[in-house]
């Protein structure tokens, strides 16, 4: 349930929890612009910068974010990317955000975009994306002090905001102020509306130079401060080892699947010149070339690490898909929702109410009926899920003027060298010819990754076989569901394929098998496995398709066809993302082992690499970032 708001007679939003107004009866717009934006020297301070990072201690109704976003849009000298990190322990509803937004047409438009993404705010970190990914809002849902200590973002400006210190003292106490100070660099400017003595003294104690300035009504005075400690702040243990680069340069990416395309796109958006190399003559030639796949959150009764990772990944996948041309919706992807048939008989949900229901909830009787499932079937409805055609998504990701694609370029070795005094990585073919060179190299080559990184990673090849077909050849009257199903396998019931509307079902998990095409015996086993999956997912459709499956072995172009590729998975079933060895092999990174979750996690992993290289706020909870990091296999243990 969202935080309740009362609306006073003068239209001011009021918090029953804190017995305080969200802003004065004069409105919050003047305060947002005068106290916070101008109080931090914005927009002048951010002009002509590659990025600017604003930290806010209380998101509230989002007005400070909207005003900052609008100012960024209006500034011709704005930074290339605006990061806005905001803490909020008690998020309100999207409807209340819209109701509280100023009448100003520009801010109303921005508020509507914000409200459209303001859902599913379970405790933790949520990355929202606007203006093609140039404006990134990272929400910390929960206790501000704890999350700031956990995430350790770097701030260029700080909006110290929240309910009155008398009503919400924890937000202003010395422990929270210390957590804020740890996020500041020398010169970071801070602004707030309160001049309470305890706040002033606390800021001074934390290393800020503080001054009173004329206030924005109804306040006589406001407070401004600059982080300028007279001591050298003690460096704590970072979330992950520092990997910040001085500036974007050149990057070579080995592998043109989902992981490679995601890394290339994320870095190109930050100003890198990227060359993508692949042994095949076209992108998405490996495991990412499947005709269609499902993206959906994982659910577990203890809301385990994979479940939390999957939600972070789905949100970024949705952000990316929403930025694609409008004509791709329904042809290359669809966020139509997914029904998960819980064949183990449990819902798997870690919640019965609250924001988790925005993500996943028990399926309704009407949904079960629409899918041809009996009323006693246990199933979940994933509202923010759907299907994607991976080759088309990869093509869109690589369609950037800063990305060059080169096929038929099998990389046999990556060599560290120096050219004109500049350390570089060179990609060599089997004859020793240089295919590409760059300051940064990222290996996204699936089960071929190990030899290229001169290291052994705990990964295994994992062959998968799909079944697919065209509706024109399917049995007449087959009871196809209205949307994808997942569970023990997944089914995309209707997707535009090259030869017409089709369906895709899969997939098998054949550990340590790499032969392509599969042997006749393995092919037959794969068909039987996928047929059994269909019976488990949707028994009526499984029965209707039995005859078609029986023809598959002797009619390769018949109603049921097959597709196979080799995926790569780590022993702990999580991607491996990060530097190979920052001391002995600086500038060599990897992003691999997506397993069966490439559509859910690849784009998140690309953003994680970009965040680490550019000292950006992490796009997910720090413990989850560590769970993905290559350092987990290299002995890094944060304190």
Curated annotation (Swiss-Prot):
Its cofactor is FAD. GO terms for biological process: methylation; tRNA wobble base modification. Pfam families: DAO, Methyltransf_30. GO terms for cellular component: cytoplasm. Residues 254-639 are annotated as: FAD-dependent cmnm(5)s(2)U34 oxidoreductase. GO terms for molecular function: flavin adenine dinucleotide binding; oxidoreductase activity, acting on the CH-NH group of donors; tRNA (5-methylaminomethyl-2-thiouridylate)(34)-methyltransferase activity. Keywords: Cytoplasm, FAD, Flavoprotein, Methyltransferase, Multifunctional enzyme, Oxidoreductase, S-adenosyl-L-methionine, Transferase, tRNA processing. Coiled coil: none annotated. PANTHER family: SARCOSINE DEHYDROGENASE-RELATED (PTHR13847), TRNA 5-METHYLAMINOMETHYL-2-THIOURIDINE BIOSYNTHESIS BIFUNCTIONAL PROTEIN MNMC (PTHR13847:SF283). This is tRNA 5-methylaminomethyl-2-thiouridine biosynthesis bifunctional protein MnmC. It comes from Acidovorax sp. (strain JS42). The gene is mnmC.
């Amino acid at each position: 349930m969202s935080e309740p708001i009362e609306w006073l007679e003068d239209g001011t939003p009021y918090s029953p929890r804190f017995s305080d107004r969200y802003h004065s009866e004069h409105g919050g717009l003047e305060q947002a612009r005068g106290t916070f934006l101008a109080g931090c020297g914005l927009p002048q301070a951010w002009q002509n910068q590659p990025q600017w990072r604003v930290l806010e201690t209380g998101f509230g109704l989002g007005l400070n974010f909207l005003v900052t976003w609008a100012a960024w849009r209006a500034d011709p000298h704005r930074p290339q990317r605006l990061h806005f990190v905001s803490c909020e322990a008690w998020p309100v509803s999207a409807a209340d955000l819209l109701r509280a937004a100023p009448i100003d047409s520009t801010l109303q438009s921005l508020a509507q975009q914000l409200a459209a993404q303001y859902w599913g705010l379970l405790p933790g970190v949520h990355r929202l994306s606007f203006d093609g990914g140039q404006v990134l809002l990272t929400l910390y849902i929960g206790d501000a002090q704890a999350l700031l200590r956990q995430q350790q973002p770097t701030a260029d400006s700080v909006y110290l905001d929240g309910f009155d210190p008398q009503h919400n003292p924890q937000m202003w106490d010395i422990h929270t102020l210390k957590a804020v100070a740890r996020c500041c660099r020398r010169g970071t400017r801070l602004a707030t509306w309160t001049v309470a003595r305890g706040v002033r003294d606390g800021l001074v104690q934390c290393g800020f130079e503080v001054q009173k300035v004329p206030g924005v009504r109804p306040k006589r005075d406001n407070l401004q401060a600059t982080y300028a400690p007279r001591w050298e702040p003690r460096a704590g243990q970072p979330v992950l080892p520092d990997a910040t680069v001085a500036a974007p340069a050149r990057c070579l990416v080995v592998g043109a699947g989902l992981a490679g395309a995601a890394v290339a796109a994320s870095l190109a958006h930050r100003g890198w010149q990227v060359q993508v190399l692949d042994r095949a003559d076209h992108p998405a030639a490996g495991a990412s070339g499947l005709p269609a796949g499902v993206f959906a959150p994982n659910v577990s009764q203890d809301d385990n690490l994979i479940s939390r990772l999957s939600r972070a990944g789905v949100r970024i996948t949705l952000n990316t898909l929403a930025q694609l041309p409008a004509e791709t919706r329904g042809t290359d992807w669809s966020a139509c929702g997914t029904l998960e048939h819980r064949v183990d008989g449990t819902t798997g949900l870690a919640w019965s109410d609250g924001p988790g229901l925005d993500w996943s909830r028990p399926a309704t009787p009407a949904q079960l009926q629409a899918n041809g499932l009996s009323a006693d079937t246990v199933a979940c409805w994933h509202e923010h899920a759907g299907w994607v055609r991976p080759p088309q998504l990869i093509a869109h990701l690589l369609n950037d003027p800063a990305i060059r694609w080169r096929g038929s370029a099998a990389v046999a070795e990556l060599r560290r060298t120096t050219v004109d005094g500049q350390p570089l990585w060179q990609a060599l073919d089997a004859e020793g010819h240089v295919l590409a060179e760059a300051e940064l190299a990222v290996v996204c080559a699936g089960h071929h990754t190990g030899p290229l990184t001169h290291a052994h990673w705990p990964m295994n090849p994992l062959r998968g076989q799909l079944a697919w077909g065209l509706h024109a050849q399917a049995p007449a009257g087959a009871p196809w569901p209205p949307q994808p199903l997942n569970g023990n396998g997944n089914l995309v019931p209707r997707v535009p394929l090259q030869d017409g509307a089709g369906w895709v079902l899969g997939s098998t998990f054949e550990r340590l098998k790499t032969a392509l095409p599969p042997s006749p015996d393995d092919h037959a086993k794969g068909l039987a496995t996928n047929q059994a999956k269909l019976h488990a997912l949707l028994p009526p459709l499984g029965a209707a398709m039995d005859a078609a499956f029986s023809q598959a072995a002797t009619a390769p172009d018949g109603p049921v066809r097959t597709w196979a590729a080799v995926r790569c998975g780590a022993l702990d079933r999580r991607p491996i993302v990060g530097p190979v060895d920052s001391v002995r092999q600086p500038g060599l990174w990897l992003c691999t082992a997506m397993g069966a979750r490439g559509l859910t996690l690849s784009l998140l992993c690309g953003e994680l690499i970009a965040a680490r290289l550019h000292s950006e706020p992490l796009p997910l909870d720090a413990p989850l970032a560590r769970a993905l990091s290559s350092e987990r296999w290299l002995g890094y243990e944060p304190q």
